[in-house]
């Protein structure tokens, strides 16, 4: 029969591009698991009382081309003014070699957090470059890589100061009043939940306030004044008060390092190192501190270690500080954040080198000084006499100045009483300075730039200029031609294993396809170039896209409202718990502070709860991995009027749909608590059920899991929160940007009003191309894929937890403990051996020690699933060889895995041959790790977190 035009138009073509198993493959897989249809399989697995009766109203699927055309039309509604607003955001030039070879390269943006260092040496080296950049510019001893944004880094600095303070009774944190307003906003929020007293005053008044544990200063104030805080910080040190300094990363190329001036903690945004403003993000924050604070620092730290062969290798160090291990006692709830952006910033420094960076910073500063002199000669008053790149100009007719600016297509900072602010940047040229002078003065003449340049004096005193060299390491002085830079980045990429080479079956991580069509819009200048504090009418396209995406997510979650501000899943948890706290306080029930958390929960949950000022009570799980309802009732009753909420993940972290989830919600509500449903496993809910329908009050969504934003090697992410109507007034708002009906008046949790807005087009594209039916199919196939793996592997590796009919949800936990007890082969050995088969390991020892948690997602075809299954079965056969005594327990292919090319070329002394070691899956498409198994203990005992000679790699 002839196909109809509608069929030939194939509007739902993308669904089959995104979902890995073809229709025939799905039939085969369903037969393998013993089901006759996807619908029948879901009916066996998902409790009937929570299944949706109707599809969410998110529209039908469309093609990649049509979705791109629709989004392009929306993007064109954004007006591309030149923004000289400053306030921590500046226009940049992203080097095309970095744009093409990193930001647009799936070998970089689809990788996961480098928990498996053997398959992550490339991005670990890039992150070490970022840390070295941070160390050189700040003048401090230890740096992390990296944090979410400058404002949240300020909050982390405040918390670090409290943890590190020797003044244990002190509870007051002082903040200079010329810190960026969005930073003040986030600090107020965080201080409130921590119970700190926050004092905001002139910096000179800091010493007048008693009971201080820390002080936050901004080296170049928000209105542009360059400060000399040396004497103040010396006195603070004498009084054992910790000095935290917010710094502009590019300014530090010219200015004296704050660490050399007495600062204990230095932080800021690395956005100016090649990362577009993107209407607020994503951008990586840098963070550095003194050596004695290292074990209290937030965020991931990359260190130099060695592998089993004694060769130099890199890894994340001091992981026992982090939320996935220390839970409510963690330094922070932050997981790896903004790695892709930190890598861009680090490679920007590698590409330009110290001389190139000095040229860029020097040009910006010189143009600023020329403009300042021109304005001074026009009898205008400048608020400050020392600056780097920002001027505050007093004007009589402010409205007239702003009108001329608007007519010229430029934005000035307008929130300063009686003045306008002007911040120059890397893109500023002579013509811009000319236009700015005309706009501010109202004069029609021209500015004699060369004459002013010849006559201008340096406004920065010598004692505030940098005297120590920066970026002397060879990595910053070698790759300045595009050819060399391209090859260096490719060498780093080849060391890593990302989704462009193999499935990454990490449980609880949802490493699904990040389609090219979804990624294309993030580099469109209409999205990339907007300042987050530009006039709202200039961001009409962003507002429409965000509003539409919010409506879709509300439909998919069953909630009434959505807040797009949290720029990570951890931030979403904090924001959701904060909404619960504010809600209770609004009802005069501020005593409700107990958060119930199942023992199976991810460590971020208790870490977020303590950050929100709550105390954690653990609820037991039964032998089947489900929440123990008897224990829940007892704990809820015991908490009584102090019960704030429960944090629960669904499907559970054990990989099953708990039949009693609605009863869990009812019990908590009965005692006056709220239900926080963690959205980590939303990929098994979309289109099938929803948190709101289940009975939850608030959830965060990991857009970097369920909705296709790539993991980027450890960020960026987005963690918007959906809430029921009664919590809607209590979600984060923003001090700087006021949008009635869109943003509340509550305090912020992130620097920008819509978090990392420039990556939201990825999720918009995914939902638009999939439509309601495609989204449901994605969830169904994710569940099918997990059950296919569980069915085929359960004889070799027991599946620890199953639900009804022996089924799992979208992930399964393989129990390695019996094998370890019998043979000594551990989950670690299996994880490392999988590298030789060309796979990234599943999640190790979470949520149960001695297990592997596997989540294949819907994007993997049967061919790739079979390749993984075959690898796991082959490894099981290898374990049997150890059990049978064919290979010694101390010298076999597993305990020595993985194998490098160097090792194969050397002397071979093992009781198995090289082919078994390095080519267990054959010779085709072989992935070679750059290093052997890491020596974790050595790396933590011999802490070294800066660049080593390139010859060591």
From Swiss-Prot:
Enzyme nomenclature, EC number: 1.4.4.2
Biological role stated in the UniProt entry: The glycine cleavage system catalyzes the degradation of glycine. The P protein binds the alpha-amino group of glycine through its pyridoxal phosphate cofactor; CO(2) is released and the remaining methylamine moiety is then transferred to the lipoamide cofactor of the H protein.
Catalyzed reactions per annotation: N(6)-[(R)-lipoyl]-L-lysyl-[glycine-cleavage complex H protein] + glycine + H(+) = N(6)-[(R)-S(8)-aminomethyldihydrolipoyl]-L-lysyl-[glycine-cleavage complex H protein] + CO2
rRNA-binding as UniProt keyword: no
Name of the gene this protein is made from: gcvP
N6-(pyridoxal phosphate)lysine: modified positions: 705
Protein name stated in the entry: Glycine dehydrogenase (decarboxylating)
Record-level GO cellular component terms: cytosol; glycine cleavage complex
InterPro entries: GcvP, GDC-P_C, GDC-P_N, GDC_P, PyrdxlP-dep_Trfase, PyrdxlP-dep_Trfase_major, PyrdxlP-dep_Trfase_small
GO MF annotation terms: glycine binding; glycine dehydrogenase (decarboxylating) activity; pyridoxal phosphate binding
Top-rank taxon: Bacteria
Leading EC class: oxidoreductase
Disulphide linkage map: none
Cofactors demanded by this protein: pyridoxal 5'-phosphate
Family label: Belongs to the GcvP family.
Signal peptide start-end: none
Description of how the protein assembles with itself and partners: The glycine cleavage system is composed of four proteins: P, T, L and H.
Pfam families in alphabetical order: GcvP2_C, GDC-P
Sorted UniProt keywords: Oxidoreductase, Pyridoxal phosphate
GO BP term (any one): glycine decarboxylation via glycine cleavage system
